[in-house]
Amino acid sequence: MAKGRVAERSQMGADHTTPVGDGAAGTRGPAAPGSRDYQKEKSWAEAGSARMSLLILVSIFLSAAFVMFLVYKNFPQLSEEERVNMKVPRDMDDAKALGKVLSKYKDTFYVQVLVAYFATYIFLQTFAIPGSIFLSILSGFLYPFPLALFLVCLCSGLGASFCYMLSYLVGRPVVYKYLTEKAVKWSQQVERHREHLINYIIFLRITPFLPNWFINITSPVINVPLKVFFIGTFLGVAPPSFVAIKAGTTLHQPTTAGEAVSWNSIFILMILAVLSILPAIFQKKLKQKFE
């Protein structure tokens, strides 16, 4: 008899249970794919993911900016005029003014100047802030050519790799939302050159076909390995850096950025770009021939 009562109560509970999606009870089940509610839920989820990514990115940026502040505070005591010139150069005049300040303290405070240059360059590259080209020019003014070239290549490789990792961690929603079409096109190009990807990245770094910031933030999304990305960037920025460093040796002269880069330099860059992609072309031709 007790069993009969339990069964009866269970049946009564079942009769009063509100089905999933019953509007009278105010509950809703998961929306069907393709429905308007499903699209709204998907949009809300994407917006929430984008907001969280932006919050993380801002936090990382503020932390990096604080590190830059500490680097600046560790710099030698500067006069008022020198402090005005201690800024990221936006043109050749700014680069010359900053070069004069740094060259004054370089011999006495060699490590501090080198660390400040290194940190600033990587900071700009990591967050895709314009101005690194003038720091490349400035390196030719401050340091011997071999050190300047190695320093610029290393800073470019590390900064671009940090940008890559930022995109991998928090930048995917931005790429998916705003750069989908361009990322898909570049993904197709990467797949064509997957067997010789280092040569392809070197070629892209030498040539102006794709902006560097676009390469940095989309590479992790389309599965370019970080090791290949770093090596290709380190080697690929060397030819343009060669031109910029050479221009830095004339920084004391009254020149503009356009005058500092000659047509001979541009011609050399074009030749190096072609040479960087030739191994991939020959490999593809040989493969087609033997197949």
Swiss-Prot record:
The family line of this record is: Belongs to the TMEM41 family.
Q: Which InterPro entries would you find in this protein's record?
A: TM41A/B, VTT_dom
Species of the source: Pongo abelii (Sumatran orangutan)
Q: What is this protein called?
A: Transmembrane protein 41B
Q: Which domain of life is it from?
A: Eukaryota
Residues covered by region (VTT domain): 140-251
Its GO CC terms are: endoplasmic reticulum membrane; mitochondria-associated endoplasmic reticulum membrane contact site
Q: How does it assemble?
A: Interacts with VMP1. Interacts with COPA, COPB1, VDAC1 and ERLIN2. Interacts with ATG2A. Interacts with SURF4.
